[in-house]
Amino acid sequence: MARPKIALIGAGQIGGTLAHLAAIKELGDVVLFDIAEGTPQGKALDIAQSGPSEGFDAVMKGANSYEDIAGADVCIVTAGVPRKPGMSRDDLIGINLKVMKSVGEGIKAHAPNAFVICITNPLDAMVWALQQFSGLPPEKVVGMAGVLDSARFRHFLSVEFNVSMRDVTAFVLGGHGDTMVPLVRYSTVAGIPLPDLVQMGWTSQEKLDQIVQRTRDGGAEIVGLLKTGSAYYAPATSAIEMAEAYLKDQKRLLPCAAWVDGAFGLDGMYVGVPTIIGAGGIEKVVDIKLNADEQAMFDKSVDAVKGLVAACKGIEPSLA
C-alpha cells in the first residue's frame, strides 16, 4: 500500500516546518510546492537529509509546478504574504485573494480528491475563497484557526495554573482575528470548568480576562516580537494535527473554520466552530449551546467574517 501523499503549497517558514513534522510523524510522502525556484527543492533536500538521524523514510520533493501535487491526499495551503508589525490579518486580503485563486485552480486541476487545509490569512475569508475557486466539496476544505487559537489559550492557562497542558482543554469559536471567542465556560483543567477554578481561588476573574485577551492577541504578540514575519511552529503543528485526524480517521473533535449551514443559526458560511474530523473530512459540526453573552460575541465575530467575505466579492467579481 502506497504511503499517503501530502502536498504543501507554500515553502515558507510554515511550509518547511509542516514538511519536517509530516516526515517525523511519517504521515506520508511530501511534495513542497512554491513559485520561488530553488526554495522548495532546497528545503526538501535539507529535510530529507535529516531522515537518517530522525529515522524516517518519507520521500521529500520540491516542486514549482502544480502537476507535481497530482493525486495528493492532503493539501495544506500556506501560500501568501505573512503579517508584518502593525498589519492586521485583514490587511492581507487583496494580495492573498489572488494567491488563493491560483492555488484553488491548481488543486482543482490536479488534486480534486484531497482534504484541503488553509492557513493563509485572513483565514476565514481565504478558506471560503479557496473552496469557491477549487470547487471542492465544503466538507473537504477547512481553515486552520481554532486548533491554534485553542492551543494558545491552553498554553496560557497551563502556565497560570502551573499544571500540565495535557490536562487543559479549551476551545475558541468564531473568526480567526480580534473578534474570536475563547469559550471560558467550556474550558477545563482535568474536567473542572474555569469558572469553578475562579471560585476555588486558583485564579481571579481579572487574570482570566487577561488570558482571554492575550489569546485574541496571540498572533499579533508574536508578529511584534519577530518583526519580520509571523508565527510558524504552532500553526504548523496545529495543521498537522488536523491532517493526521483525516488520514488516520481519528474522529477528533477539533475547532476549525468549517462550512456551517444550519448549525449555530447560520445559513452557509465559513467560521470557527467545533467539528469532528475523520476520513470524510469535516464529518460533523458540533452545535453547542451558547449563553447570551457568548452568543453576542459569536454574532460579532460572524459579522466580521461576513465583512471580509463581502470585501473578497468586491475585489474578485467571479466570487460575487
Curated annotation (Swiss-Prot):
Tell me, what is an example of a GO biological process annotation in this record? tricarboxylic acid cycle
| Source superkingdom | Bacteria
InterPro entries registered for this protein in UniProt:
L-lactate/malate_DH (IPR001557), Lactate/malate_DH_C (IPR022383), Lactate/malate_DH_N (IPR001236), Lactate_DH/Glyco_Ohase_4_C (IPR015955), Malate_DH_type3 (IPR011275), NAD(P)-bd_dom_sf (IPR036291)
Binding residue positions for NAD(+): G10, A11, G12, Q13, I14, G15, D34, N96, I119, T120, N121
Provide the alphabetized UniProt keywords.
NAD, Oxidoreductase, Tricarboxylic acid cycle
Instruction: Give a GO molecular function annotation for the protein.
Output: L-lactate dehydrogenase activity
Q: Active site located where?
A: H176 (proton acceptor)
Q: Where does substrate bind?
A: R83, R89, N121, R152
Per the UniProt entry, the Enzyme Commission number(s) are: 1.1.1.37
Reactions mediated catalytically: (S)-malate + NAD(+) = oxaloacetate + NADH + H(+)
Q: Which SUPFAM superfamilies match?
A: LDH C-terminal domain-like (SSF56327), NAD(P)-binding Rossmann-fold domains (SSF51735)
Matching entries from NCBIfam families are given as: MalateDH_bact (TIGR01763), PRK06223.1 (NF004863)
Primary role: Catalyzes the reversible oxidation of malate to oxaloacetate.
HAMAP family in UniProt: Malate_dehydrog_3
Family assignment from sequence similarity: Belongs to the LDH/MDH superfamily. MDH type 3 family.
The name this protein carries in UniProt is Malate dehydrogenase
| Phylogenetic lineage | Bacteria, Pseudomonadati, Pseudomonadota, Alphaproteobacteria, Rhodobacterales
